[in-house]
Amino acid sequence: MREVNFSIPNVNKASVNITTTLYDRRALDCTSTLPLINSLNHLAYLTTSSARIRDILTVDGGIERLVCILKEGRSRDLMEMWKWSLAFQCVVNIGVRGSESVRTRVVEADMVPVIATILDNYIKVVDKARARADPDTQRHSSRHHAKPVPTAGEPSARPSLLEQAAHTEQRASRRQAPPPNIEIPPYFQDNHVADSNAMDISSSPRAPMTSPPERSTFGQEAHNHRTHDPRYLHPGHRQRAMQPLATALPPMDAADGFGLRPVRDTERLPSMLPGLQNGITSQPDSPTTPSGPIQARNNAATTVPVQRPTLRQQRSASGDSDDGNAESFSMEDGARSEATSEPIVQNQMEIDEVGDRQAMLNGVSDGHDLTVTDPSEGQEAETFNITHRSTVDGSTINNGNTQTNTALGLSPAQAANTTNSPNIVPSPYSLYFRDRSATASQNVLTTMPRDEDVLMSLQLLAYVSKYCNLRSYFQNSHFVPKLKVDRELQMFEDGSSPMETAEEEDEYLLPDDVNIFPLVEKFTVRHHSKDMQYWACVVMRNLCRKDESRGGIRQCAYYKCGKWEEFQRQFAKCRRCRRTKYCSKDCQKAAWVYHRHWCHTTP
């Protein structure tokens, strides 16, 4: 039997691969993971920059091969994860940057079931995390109210600087009520020990001792944050916050007029501390290696599971769009002309600025206690990006990077280094599962979709769902059995260990009874990130488009109805947004449960 991996002996190549200057369809049929990853890595660049490559992939079976790689399912092997992510990136590039005919071929290649499975998995994981987080929050809340309140003089009554910054950012970025306070031990233990032995020397006739510049800066930042926080407006706290850090030194000999003092452990280099030598490893700042933490937040080293590699996302070398519709790429072209400090994805629709939004969402937002800073809002959320910024992930650019790092106690030099190094995006729900070190939790963590996977799925849907002739593919789809995470979620619920993989049902025997629009509509709820809300709203607005091929009629916006107009303007529009149409009042009332999240007033 002939080997499927083609080789080129005359150029000393063990297998055919795709480069940035050469596309070879045979490279996608390689069964070896490493050369296939190399080819997919270069293909991700070609699909971004070359319209001809995108057109070739639609006629030579390249898209079908990429979809087959995606339908093979995820694996906990790092290389297999990388292969799946790169193949997914290639398909998204083809669909987002391609013309109408190219996008049609992406839908016809059965990409919609893959997207539907990704969205469904993410919703299930989110619901599972929130269902398990609610009892935990209530238990911590009852424990917090039961324990006595410490006095102002105790070190435990003073939250750490990181907790203060996080609390201030949460109050400024969110409008719903904050969750109950949870007692978190302070990070900087050595600072509290020093404060307990501090001696106030402000009344001494000697000149006040000075501290190094970086220490003075740190004290000023701490003072600024505490003065803005109403919890620190008490006289006792104000007096302690206004003292420079030099006052927290042990008593010194009065004959020492030069202000010299013994070097403490906190001012030594990490390599000089005997207790940290075993835990320090060098982290090369390479494009493919995530950087280590800039500043240690706790002396105890915690074990973090291996994160999946992200996608190599390349920006387009050509500024022209392959689609004649300039409206589709106006957002992308505008972002490409801006400086690198601006977000790539410009959200033209601001959901929080809609009137009466808070009153409508109180019933939904108050029920969720898994409150973690939004990755697209909180600038302290780190981003996992290997080499290039994505046209999808707008959170890779931090406009307020210097201000945020200063609030966290980092120096400006450290903040500059952070922007040049690849970081990891801490998803709120992945962090929830990561904190639980059980085997079942790690299985869910490795198989659950990442935020960027969901974001790219929604963006791809936003570009392909505006064609009414393809609407049947979205309303009559199915789930891919090998991509579902039901087994991992069941293991997490039961706390059982991995078992033998059961025989999976054949995908092509499944009925096409899945409508993808109700899944997308769930991402318009406010507990998802702003980018997810934006692209989900775009997809839902595309559902309200009129079909010009059928005489300009529209479909009822309630997904369980699906009735079409018999003539133009037969159905009544929503009075608030003037976009959606319903065949009856009953359909409008039934659809209002989720429609209220993307129903925006028109000027």
UniProtKB/Swiss-Prot annotation:
Residues 133-239, 269-347, 361-398 are annotated as: Disordered. A zinc finger (MYND-type) spans 558-599. GO terms for molecular function: zinc ion binding. Pfam families: zf-MYND. PROSITE patterns: ZF_MYND_1, ZF_MYND_2. Residues 222-232 have a biased composition (Basic and acidic residues). Its main location: cytoplasm. It comes from the Eukaryota. It is found in: Cytoplasm. Zn(2+) binds at C574, C577, H595, C599. InterPro entries: ARM-type_fold, MYND-type_zinc_finger, Znf_MYND. GO terms for biological process: establishment or maintenance of cell polarity; positive regulation of flocculation; sporulation resulting in formation of a cellular spore; ubiquitin-dependent protein catabolic process. Keywords: Cytoplasm, Metal-binding, Sporulation, Zinc, Zinc-finger. GO terms for cellular component: cytoplasm; MUB1-RAD6-UBR2 ubiquitin ligase complex. Residues 278-319, 338-347, 382-398 have a biased composition (Polar residues). Belongs to the MUB1/samB family. Involved in determination of the onset of polarized growth and morphogenesis. Plays a role in the regulation of branching in hyphae and spore formation. This is MYND-type zinc finger protein samB. It comes from Aspergillus terreus (strain NIH 2624 / FGSC A1156).
